[in-house]
Design a protein with these regions (language model features):
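Gly/Pro/Ser/Thr-rich low-complexity, intrinsically disordered segments predominantly at protein N-termini
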Residues: 1-198
Length: 198
């Protein structure tokens, strides 16, 4: 007689007790996904995007750019976008749990997380109330934009114009500069998923 497979379900409190071992631990409705440390190309693009967003938004008080960020919805969901834009008035809290105005989540697609980011996290962010999600495709040197109430994965190359309803004016990002001098190694373009369930 076959035995039923039991998949462990975790809480945000459980996740806080996990080791700080260089891997990324995330929860989606209690399901745990572990992905390895990202490659150089992934980190370079994420850093450039965070820097470009910070520069473009510096005249907007109360808007912050971090990378990586954390989106928490207790008790069983905690996701870590590579770059996150959020609004917070006054002194910043030390707890991600208290942030509720996340305006943008950015995921840089990499072999260890490509399928998970594209097929699960994108929709999870939107369902959690994040109004816009960018998936950054290193292979195509493009950004796939998904917004609440709009068709997903609108492909943008060259110049990205972010016309968020939260901003008093659009901002523009030069994607050619973001992807400049990017020579991806085989491990960063083969699209294999290496994340594993604990």
């Amino acid at each position: 007689m076959a035995m039923a497979l039991t998949i462990p379900r975790y809480t945000v409190a459980d996740l806080e007790r996990f080791p700080d071992d260089g891997q990324r631990y995330e929860l989606l409705d209690g399901l745990l996904l572990v992905t390895p440390s990202p490659g150089v190309g992934h980190q370079l693009v994420a850093t450039r995007l965070a820097s470009a967003l910070t520069g473009a938004l510096e005249s907007h008080p109360g808007i912050h750019v971090v990378g990586p960020g954390v989106v928490v919805r207790e008790p069983r969901t905690q996701l870590q976008p590579d770059v996150m834009v959020f609004r917070a008035e006054g002194p910043l809290t030390a707890s991600w749990k208290e942030l509720r105005e996340t305006w943008l989540a950015v995921e840089v697609l990499s072999p260890g997380s490509r399928v998970y980011d594209r097929d699960f996290k994108r929709d999870a962010y939107l369902a959690l109330g994040v109004p816009e999600v960018w998936l950054v495709d290193l292979r195509e040197r493009a950004v796939l934009i998904s917004r609440t109430g709009a068709p997903p994965d609108q492909r943008v190359t060259g110049l990205l114009r972010w016309d968020s309803p939260h901003l008093d004016r659009p901002i523009e990002l030069d994607l050619n500069r973001i992807f400049a001098d990017l020579a991806l190694g085989k491990g960063e373009v083969n699209g294999k998923t290496t994340g594993r369930h604990r």
